[in-house]
Design a protein with these regions (language model features):
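Residue-level signature of extracellular beta-strand-rich folds
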Residues: 21, 88, 147-149, 159-161, ...
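Surface-exposed binding patches on compact interaction domains or structured appendages
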Residues: 39-43, 48-52, 155-179
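Solvent-exposed loop segments of extracellular immunoglobulin-like
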Residues: 17, 25-39, 153-164
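Strand-loop-strand motifs at the edges of beta-sheets in extracellular beta-sandwich domains
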Residues: 54-78, 170-194, 206
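Extracellular Ig-like/FN3 beta-sandwich strand-entry sites
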Residues: 16, 81-85, 142, 184-186, ...
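A short beta-strand micro-motif common to beta-rich folds, especially ectodomain repeats
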Residues: 83-94, 199-212
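Extracellular interdomain linkers/hinges and stalk-like, low-complexity segments
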Residues: 1-28, 97-153, 215-221
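Short helix-loop boundary/capping segments
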Residues: 9, 28-66
Length: 221
């Protein structure tokens, strides 16, 4: 497997925040995400050794630094300013047997808080899969999912979308457009899936919103 989404460095203090590195396996093997211990350099050991005494970055009261094992979404409400290191581990399973894993050591820099871009709750998705919004598409029929994002502090929101549907021979497309509200933008996911894309497990898509200072990732199926 490999990661589809580039790392995020900056995030706001005392603000609920999400990031998804989105590991992907082209062979279709099962993936499980977890938080690991960052490694330090070690002579003669190319992978390094776990940092002794490492603890997860500090979180606001009643919250934890956590990762969803199914989607890979990292959730954190940082409680203090500073630089923090963490590790995402993605294990690969085939027929219930672990056959490999990848790690990504990353750094977060927590800065004073300003408003972050938010994805408005989609009113055209009524289903969910393990608590994540689930949109249904039918093979042979055009599929369009319109979403809206808002940021009260800026009039320019940039958006990107990542996921397996964009890597297929018959790829999904992603468009961003204006609305009547200068602080609000429209996002459209469009696809014409064929019978070849039909499968039991849903496709995971990550939408990233950026306001020039911070970004927020949102996962949906």
């Amino acid at each position: 497997p490999f990661f589809l989404v580039k790392p995020v460095v900056f995030l706001p203090v005392n603000t609920p925040w999400q990031y998804n590195p989105l590991p992907y396996d082209p062979d279709g093997d099962s993936l499980s995400w977890s938080l690991g211990i960052p490694h330090d350099e070690s002579t003669g050991n190319p992978t390094g050794i776990p940092i002794a005494g490492y603890t997860n970055p500090p979180s606001a009261s009643g919250t934890t630094f956590s990762i969803d094992p199914l989607t890979g979404t990292i959730s954190w409400t940082a409680s203090v300013l500073g630089n923090f290191v963490y590790t995402v581990t993605c294990e690969e399973f085939r027929n219930g047997v672990k056959i490999g894993e990848i790690r990504r050591d990353m750094q977060f820099i927590v800065l004073p808080s300003v408003p972050t871009p938010q994805l408005l709750p989609p009113n055209n998705i009524s289903s969910s899969y393990n608590g994540v919004p689930l949109a249904l598409a039918v093979a042979g029929y055009p599929f369009t999912l319109n979403l809206f994002a808002m940021d009260s502090s800026v009039t320019t929101i940039l958006a990107e979308a990542f996921g397996e549907p964009f890597l297929l021979n018959n790829p999904m497309t992603f468009l961003q457009g204006n609305t009547d509200d200068p602080f609000k933008t429209k996002l459209s996911l469009m696809w014409l899936p064929s019978i070849n894309e039909v499968r039991e497990n849903p496709y995971l898509v990550v939408v990233r919103l950026m306001n020039g200072t911070f970004s927020m990732d949102y996962s949906l199926y």
